[in-house]
Amino acid sequence: MIDALKNGEIKAPYMVVTYNQTKGIGSRGNSWEGLGGNVFMSFCISEDELPSDIPPPTISIYFSMLMREVLSELGSKCWLKWPNDFYVDGRKIGGTLTNKVDEIYICGMGINLASAPENAGILDIKASVDELVWGFVSMLDKKILWKPIFSKFRIDFCKSKSFITHIANRAVSLQDAEICDDGAILLNGEKVYSLR
């Protein structure tokens, strides 16, 4: 999608949804292959189509929390691990990755609905791809401000403290991390933003 946007083949807003992903990119540049029966979507949206109070480095948190809201409304107990992973019962069920080209955000999101790689989980409720995609689009259209989104994320962040995250290619415990109002974390006196 990034190349298509740069080449002028598509214009924001634009979304693609698939049940199989063969050339996905995960966090830290890892390749990502999605298993069949799950939902994978990529979309691009102009920065001026979003609430102006969103701190740009935390846009993945914002998009992820919108989807988490959709899942919660459908009855899921999923939560968001800092900075961009969906979890149920201690297992990762999906994630979000966002890039920016000029004033356009490009976001990829995947959620395991039916199958999962080893050591990962699947969504804890039955939900269709249409329910998730259209629910997400509806949430996006509401242009919910950062503050109410962040207040819910702050609660989820407490669960993140029993996990690790990767910072500068190192596995780092989140046990002593503190969340900042802009979605960054304070870790050992250093402010760290998610660049995913």
Annotate each language-model stretch with its function.
Residues 7, 48-78, 88-196:
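Long, positively charged amphipathic alpha-helical accessory segments at protein N-termini or as interdomain linkers
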Residues 1-69, 73:
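N-terminal lobe of the biotin/lipoate ligase/transferase fold
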